[in-house]
Amino acid sequence: MSSLLIGYYSKTGNTKAMAEYIAAGAREAGANVDLLPIENVTVPSLLSYDGIILGSPDYYGGMAAPVKQLLDDSVRLHGQLAGKVGGAFSSAANIGGGNETTILGIIHGLLVHGMIVPGVAVGDHYGPVSINAPDERVERQCKKYGLLIADIARRLKDEG
């Protein structure tokens, strides 16, 4: 059984709702999930997870400051997160408002750590996105993403 962290920053509740859907999908796959506001995530705790998924609203085409701060502070663990599975998700107010650039910014930080970040062949390719409050499509994408990350984390753990 794999253990996942889903850390998120949410001002309006939209990103939190996405995180909850992702957690539901991961739990369906049998993962132990810690669902935490980003302010409650500590850098040392990142070592205890097989997979780390971070979510942020889009702020001017990038991630919220608390998410960026966690990634910046995680430099203390450089190299120690290599081989873990990572992922990202985002919400925004507008279509074309910066969801993908926000997700890619988070993914860049995960890749620098040597984490494995899978793409999604059908749907939201870089990770789930929502425009305003998550609708049924977003709920499906989030649950599917949680299943995907949990399954990969479990397989890697079983092989390791």
Provide a role label for each language-model segment.
Residues 2-5, 14-160:
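FMN-binding flavodoxin-like domain, especially the glycine-rich phosphate-binding loop
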